[in-house]
Amino acid sequence: MLDPQAVLAQARQGRAPASWRVFTKARGRVRGFLRGTSADPDPLLVITPDGVAEYVDSKKPVAVVDFDSLSGISLRVSGSTFSDSIQVRLDVWLDVHHRDGRKSKWRSASFADQYQTVQAFIEAYGAHQAFRSAGLHPR
């Protein structure tokens, strides 16, 4: 079972194992001031072999995905553009299928435009599934 507080604390202290992917960025000063979160630690997303933990700010609960509770994931992409533009805006997320039949949408709240977070999730979940199917514990 994933302990999100322990994962976030270990990553924040710079002690993340090589098998973890850690994403962080400085909190925007203006936005932090306006939301009343300027004293909060910076946003932090940690993807481990067991799941995902994300801290956004003190006003939001820690987001957790425990890979053991999933039955599958599906990559989803939607594109949009304006008629007078050659630029396409991509919206990328994962449909997360839970063992209890629920389906939810996963996209990092703080790193939504950094597609490598979705790639890291897919890689970690795939490795987790491979280890589990071989009867091993991912580490």
Language-model features and meaning:
Residues 1-49:
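Anionic N-terminal interaction surfaces
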